[in-house]
Amino acid sequence: MSVWRPSDNKVYLPPPPVSKVVSTDEYVQRTNYFYHASSSRLLVVGHPYYSITKRPNKTSIPKVSGLQYRVFRVRLPDPNKFTLPETNLYNPETQRMVWACVGLEVGRGQPLGVGISGHPLLNKLDDTENAPTYGGGPGTDNRENVSMDYKQTQLCLVGCKPAIGEHWGKGTACTPQSNGDCPPLELKNSFIQDGDMVDVGFGALDFGALQSSKAEVPLDIVNSITKYPDYLKMSAEAYGDSMFFFLRREQMFVRHLFNRAGAIGEPVPDELYTKAANNASGRHNLGSSIYYPTPSGSMVTSDAQLFNKPYWLQQAQGHNNGICWGNQLFLTVVDTTRSTNMTLCATATSGDTYTAANFKEYLRHAEEYDVQFIFQLCKITLTVEVMSYIHNMNPNILEEWNVGVAPPPSGTLEDSYRYVQSEAIRCQAKVTTPEKKDPYSDFWFWEVNLSEKFSTDLDQFPLGRKFLLQAGLRARPKLSVGKRKASTAKSVSSAKRKKTHK
C-alpha cells in the first residue's frame, strides 16, 4: 500500500518585497541654466601638535595640522527664492527648484612639503631592524625623543550630508575586567568633522581611551581619535547623500622598526621558540615582542596631485546624482603633501654671542584653500508619488518647501477660551512654537556661504571657462562687431565685369 509523504527538502519562500529606491534622475528635470560659485581665499593658521590655552577655558591658538580633515559646509541660496532668467521656467504651485552639482575644483595654495611629528618621551625600546646586541628586559623608563613623517594622503569627498568615518574604540566587556586587562574593541561610526585627525599610519583608533601611557604615538594624536572614511557604509547608503563621489590617493612605507617597553600582557607561547642554553647569553629572558614601525609617506611631487584640477560629475556612485538637498554641500578634504610646519624664532634676551636660551622657538602650520563649483538649475514636479517618496526619504525637505501633510481630523471637541490672560479662568499654558533646530548644529564644520556668489557669466571664471570647453559650449558674445559695407563704385565695377564676361 502506497502512502504519500511530504518532501523532506526545505521550501524557501520568496523574500518580502521592499520599497524601491530610485535615482534622482527619475524625478528631477534638469534645465539648461548653469551657475558658477566660488569662495574667497580660505586661510587657517595654528599650532600643528596641540592647541594653546593662555586663558582659562579659552583657546588662544587652535590646533591646525596638515594631518587634519577640512570639512567645508557650503551654503547655497534657495533656488525657489532666486532671481530666475525666465519667469515661466517653473510653476511655483506644482514645482520646486533644486541645485545639482556638476563640477568642482579644490584649489590649494602654499608649496609642497613634508610635515613631521614626534614625541619627546616615546615608548621606544630597541631598534629591532638592525640591533647591534640582543636587547634585554626593559628598564624603569626607556622612553626616547623620536620624530617621524607620516603616511601620505590626498582625499576629496563630496556629498549633501557629512561624510561618515570609522575608528576602533573601547567597547563594553561582557565580564568585569581587572586592572591591566586588554580592553575589548568596538568599531564605531561618526561624522567626520573639521579638525578631526586622519589615519597617519598607526590605525584608525581612539588613542586617548586605548593607550593610557600617553607615550605610544606622537603628540598630535596621543589624545585624539584618528578616523578613516567608511567607504563601505557610504557606498551602501540607500539614497547616496553622504558621498556623490570621492578622489583618494594614499601611500606609505616603513622607515624604522622598533618594539615597546612594558610588561607583555600576552606572552609568547613556549611552543613557538626554543629556549636559550644558558643565562649567560642574555636570551633566557625574551625581549619585547610588541613590534611597531614608524610610517613614512615618502616623496611628495606635483605629478601626483589631486588638487587644482577640475572634476565633472556625470553619474554619482549612489542614487543621488549630485542633487543638493537642503541647499548645502559637504566637501571633505585631506592633503598631507602640504603639511610643512614653519619654525618661528623670537629674541627673548639680546646678547653679543649666541646663547640658545636667549631665543624662543615656536611652531606654526598654515593652510590655504579656494573652492569653486558649477551648479545646474533643476526642477521637481510635486506629484503625489514624488512627494510621498521624498517624505519617506527626508521629510525636512518638504518642510523647507512649505509643503506640509495635513494631520488627521481630531475626534474630540477642544476648548478655546477668549480671554486667555484673564484671572477668572485657569492659567493657560504658554504655547511656544518650537524653533527648528539645525541637525548639524552640534558638529564642527568650516562654514562657506555662497548665497551671494552665484553668477551665470561662466566665461568670467577659470572653472567656468573649463566647463564651457569640456561641454562644447561657447559664451554669448558681449560685443557686436558690425560688418563694413561695400562701396558703390566697387559694386558697379563688379556688375560691369559680370556683364562684360557675358
From Swiss-Prot:
It comes from the Viruses. Residues 478-502 are annotated as: Disordered. The keyword Magnesium does not apply. InterPro entries: Capsid_L1_Papillomavir (IPR002210), Capsid_L1_sf_Papillomavir (IPR036973), dsDNA_vir_gr_I_capsid (IPR011222). This is Major capsid protein L1. Transmembrane segments: none annotated. Keywords: Capsid protein, Disulfide bond, Host nucleus, Host-virus interaction, Late protein, T=7 icosahedral capsid protein, Viral attachment to host cell, Viral penetration into host cytoplasm, Virion, Virus endocytosis by host, Virus entry into host cell. GO terms for molecular function: structural molecule activity. Forms an icosahedral capsid with a T=7 symmetry and a 50 nm diameter. The capsid is composed of 72 pentamers linked to each other by disulfide bonds and associated with L2 proteins. Binds to heparan sulfate proteoglycans on cell surface of basal layer keratinocytes to provide initial virion attachment. This binding mediates a conformational change in the virus capsid that facilitates efficient infection. The virion enters the host cell via endocytosis. During virus trafficking, L1 protein dissociates from the viral DNA and the genomic DNA is released to the host nucleus. It comes from Human papillomavirus 42. Residues 478-487 have a biased composition (Basic residues). Self-assembles into homopentamers. The capsid has an icosahedral symmetry and consists of 72 capsomers, with each capsomer being a pentamer of L1. Interacts with the minor capsid protein L2; this interaction is necessary for viral genome encapsidation. Interacts with protein E2; this interaction enhances E2-dependent replication and transcription activation. Belongs to the papillomaviridae L1 protein family. GO terms for biological process: endocytosis involved in viral entry into host cell; virion attachment to host cell. It is found in: Virion; Host nucleus. Pfam families: Late_protein_L1. The gene is L1. One of its GO terms (cellular component) is host cell nucleus.
